[in-house]
Amino acid sequence: MTLIVTGAAGFIGANIVKALNERGETRIIAVDNLTRADKFKNLVDCEIDDYLDKTEFVERFARGDFGKVRAVFHEGACSDTMETDGRYMMDNNFRYSRAVLDACLAQGAQFLYASSAAIYGGSTRFVEERSVEAPLNVYGYSKFLFDQVVRRVLPNAKSQIAGFRYFNVYGPRETHKGRMASVAFHNFNQFRAEGKVKLFGEYNGYAAGEQTRDFVSVEDVAKVNLFFFDHPEKSGIFNLGTGRAQPFNDIASTVVNTLRALDNLPPLTLAQQVEQGLIEYVPFPDALRGKYQCFTQADQTKLRAAGYDAPFLTVQEGVDRYVRWLSGQV
């Protein structure tokens, strides 16, 4: 049976395609916005059956042109949290997603989709409950609104619907994201260009570089998606993060030490890195005051209750792997 991955040439989508290939799955229809032709580079080492534009795909899928479709991994979306065009965001992230969901329900296909931790906005609790969901931007709102549709549909759905609220994802195949790429990606490139990594100084009670995020490797994101793919009886909306909040200092320090290791240099403590000017703290920008999350941490209770029991990579493990991969691409 056919598998479909939307956003297949994007960051998470391409990693899911690659993970499916590693399991021997090659009957994959890759869907993306083909107006950005250069994104195909993420699929060069992948095996797929077809590569379709997102608009053509929705029309053909609704008509049943692809025969029996087992599952759709719906990763296609505008993920730019700074985007301010509400019409574009709602068309791309909400209405498009509804059309794909409707086609999956009509054809009995599994529907696994990308939600986002941006739904939580400025909340200090990160649990899949309506009471703590308060998005701060139109991107988060578009994801929030679609999750509400899913909640209404789930009780009567005859096929799987599984949504994943991604926290701060990093890893291979994100180069095309530019300014929206992960902190690890930017730290790597900054260190190679300038010989140091710059982090925000103290803010809102957090010491310099100690603002924290739940940083999750795209390797783990792909594994969770495939776990639910293997268990079509499991539906719901789930946080997808490590359950650990780690400071930006951990990312920067791991980037520095991994690059040092590749140059056969010994590791340094964070204090030594700061003392030697390898990590530098800059004043917290006024433009971000009051709009910046200093803490995110996924509540994994629901994910673990669904049966996913594999450990998640720490920042030290995942970023080390990622930096070595990036170094091999240069």
From Swiss-Prot:
EC number(s) per entry: 5.1.3.20
Cofactor note: Binds 1 NADP(+) per subunit.
Gene Ontology MF annotations: ADP-glyceromanno-heptose 6-epimerase activity; NADP binding
UniProt cross-references to InterPro entries, sorted A to Z: Epimerase_deHydtase, Heptose_epim, NAD(P)-bd_dom_sf
Subunit note: Homopentamer.
Superkingdom of origin organism: Bacteria
Keywords, sorted A to Z: Carbohydrate metabolism, Isomerase, NADP
Cross-referenced PANTHER family: ADP-L-GLYCERO-D-MANNO-HEPTOSE-6-EPIMERASE, NUCLEOSIDE-DIPHOSPHATE-SUGAR EPIMERASE
Family: Belongs to the NAD(P)-dependent epimerase/dehydratase family. HldD subfamily.
Gene: hldD
Keyword NADP: yes
Residues annotated for substrate binding in this entry: N168, R179, H186, F200, G201, E202, Y203, R213, Y292
Role played: Catalyzes the interconversion between ADP-D-glycero-beta-D-manno-heptose and ADP-L-glycero-beta-D-manno-heptose via an epimerization at carbon 6 of the heptose.
UniProt keyword Isomerase, yes or no: yes
Pathway: Nucleotide-sugar biosynthesis; ADP-L-glycero-beta-D-manno-heptose biosynthesis; ADP-L-glycero-beta-D-manno-heptose from D-glycero-beta-D-manno-heptose 7-phosphate: step 4/4
Record protein name field: ADP-L-glycero-D-manno-heptose-6-epimerase
